[in-house]
Amino acid sequence: MAERTKFSMQWHITDRCDQRCKHCYIYEGKDKKCGLELDLDTLKAILEDFLRTCDKLERDPFLVITGGDPLLYERIWDFLEILKEKKVHFGLLGNPFHLDYDVVKRLENLGCINFQMSLDGLRETHDYIRKPGSFDATLDALKYFEGSKIKTAIMTTVSKTNIAEIPELVDIVVEHKVSNFGFARYCPNPEDFDLLVSPEEYR
């Protein structure tokens, strides 16, 4: 029987996060505080609806779970156990601060396919955008995936702040044997449109 085409959904389950990135739309208010997340019963209801949709479309479900940092979701392991029971594979978009060998192994056993973190420039630039120590923590966390079936991914949100550092950043990502490296377009707030990269600069 031929494998069905995947139906992928990116799912924001929590606002909880260790970082306060300059470009984050969740924490862009003056108080920089936001703790919204979905309770487990709501997640289960949405999941069932998603699975019914996949069945109707004759597609295999795949979830890209994000936040915030999904590892900070209070019942993340209960939720991932449900996904395993339903035979739903998933990827995570998160931070490096709650990863270790045991966490990665647990994620692998529950059906995690990939784990994406961010590098928004070289050390000084990245730490300015995200938080001090984040650059080294991200590179250090990649070691936990060595020998794992989980593929690693690095995403860079490109702005005028970091565009000149992209070539050197590519070398660093290759050196650390990251499986996938991608770019996201910077979405400016009203006060920082000057950081937006022009189409000509992207070329």
What are these regions (language model features)?
Residues M1-I113:
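Conserved alpha-helical substructure of the radical SAM core
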Residues H12, K33, N109, S118-D120, ...:
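Radical SAM enzyme [4Fe-4S]-AdoMet core and its adjacent flexible, acidic
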